[in-house]
Regions:
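Surface-exposed, charge/polar-rich loops and edge strands
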Residues: 1-119
């Protein structure tokens, strides 16, 4: 899986910790944000700043922080489809994609979006 750079300000870390302490949900807008947050919160000590992740999320991964994801429809058999399948379950994603194809949703970067919750 490719690596991605990201920056997380102190304020964001505080907001996430506050939301989680109140049983709030964390919603990632895009797979880059999901990978960044899961990578950041897998560290023993969480620090703000510029970071890089090459985390490869696949079925069996235990999600630590993200509860829901807004993302586009990814290519089947791609690493990002594997990520969303790990997040919401392979069967759920297969049904979702069958529905999207049947209803002529647009795929890829400039296509339709989907909101999925962690299984």
């Amino acid at each position: 899986m490719h690596s991605e750079s990201f920056n997380v300000p102190d304020k964001t870390i505080h907001m996430i910790n506050d939301a989680k302490s109140k049983n709030g949900r964390i919603i990632a807008i895009g797979t880059t944000v999901l990978r960044a947050l899961e990578s950041l919160f897998s560290e023993e000590t969480i620090h703000s700043g510029f970071k890089e992740t090459s985390i490869f999320i696949k079925p069996g991964y235990t999600f630590k922080i993200v509860d829901a994801l807004l993302t586009n429809f990814h290519l089947p058999k791609s690493t990002l489809f594997i990520l969303v399948s790990a997040f919401s379950g392979s069967d759920t994603m297969k049904r979702l994609y069958q529905h999207a194809i049947k209803n002529e949703y647009r795929f890829f970067s400039y296509g339709d979006a989907t909101f999925i919750e962690r299984s």
